[in-house]
């Protein structure tokens, strides 16, 4: 790569929600952009941590025993194996950092499972 990645331009290239798009790879990790609103499904990633960096809006990461609000400019690391779901009252844009091949719905599957290899 010989140029910087403009995240605003990348976010403008898609409108679908709950469908992360890969923008870069570092070693075995993907950097993904995602847009979402509403509630996601309860799930876990048994073999990897998951990082959310909020670029615009606000989100909540729900665990069975507590919630973590995450605002624009903040990040949160979800420990591997922790059952969680995300939600946003209004559209939220975030960057995910996770091991390449990580499925967005983890062990839950279902109709919100996105292709894991979509680059923009």
Listing of model-derived features with the role each one plays in the protein:
Residues 43, 61-62, 78, 83-89, ...:
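Short beta-strand His + acidic residue motifs that chelate non-heme Fe in jelly-roll/DSBH
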Residues 36-38, 47-60, 64-65:
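Glycine- and acidic-residue-biased ligand/ion/polar-headgroup-sensing regions
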Residues 29-30, 59, 66, 82:
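Short acidic/polar mixed-charge low-complexity motifs
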Residues 7-42, 48, 97:
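A short glycine-rich, His/Asp/Glu-containing loop-to-beta-strand
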Residues 27, 55-56, 71-72, 90:
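A cytosolic small-molecule/anion-sensing beta-strand core signal
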Residues 64-80:
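Short acidic-glycine-tyrosine-enriched beta hairpin
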Residues 3-11, 24, 85, 89-120:
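Double-stranded beta-helix
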């Amino acid at each position: 790569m010989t140029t910087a990645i403009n995240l605003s331009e990348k976010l403008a290239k898609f409108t679908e929600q709950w469908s992360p798009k890969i923008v870069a790879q570092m070693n075995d990790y993907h950097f993904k952009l995602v847009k979402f609103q509403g509630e996601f499904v309860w799930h876990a990633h048994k073999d990897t941590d998951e990082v959310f960096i909020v670029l615009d809006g606000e989100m909540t990461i729900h665990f069975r025993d507590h919630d973590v609000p995450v605002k624009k400019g903040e990040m949160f690391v979800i420990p591997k194996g922790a059952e969680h779901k995300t939600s946003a009252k209004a559209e939220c844009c975030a960057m995910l950092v996770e091991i390449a091949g990580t499925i967005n719905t983890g062990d839950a599957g279902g109709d919100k499972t996105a292709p894991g290899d979509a680059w923009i």
